[in-house]
């Protein structure tokens, strides 16, 4: 059994070697038409790396010619499927600018915005790329209000906005974690005001209550009563807005 597997692996390695060797010869070939034909074949077979490499080589040769539109779109799409989102976004945007009346322009515009979406990092990192992605997707939504991709674009925008909200919430919550309650109250209040419909509002209200309560009970006598009143207001808002809050027992214990 092992001998059969080893033979299969050997044959596959030989095939791969000659296949790679043939592709290298193709890259050195100066016949642009042959490269174009092979790029199309690789594209049809979803061999995105080879297709994108060939399309990149021949794209300048066909600029301004009828084939240029098809090559640019296929090149961009190959990059997208290869997950090279930075270069794919650039190529799709170039397509939109170069071929504004193409039947593929709407698809290219969405794909460009989608590439920016894919560049959005996790919430703990800088969110400049997320802001750019939201802007690009919103531009698509505004320009193509009847697009078949409208719902998907809106969903992507919502997802990115929630990511920004979560980052803002985590920053605000951090002040509570390090027991800087004065700053926590200020930042959590700002968060709740800025994002009234956020899915993290319940959590923000609890940590606002906790910060207000901790600040009050650790205050000097002259400030304690007023600060306790403020904490009670936040507690009542939490319980009224979320009567089955996951923080009910913890909040009730502090109030007692």
Regions found by a protein language model. Give the residues of each.
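Bacterial N-terminal signal peptides that target proteins for export
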Residues: 1-9
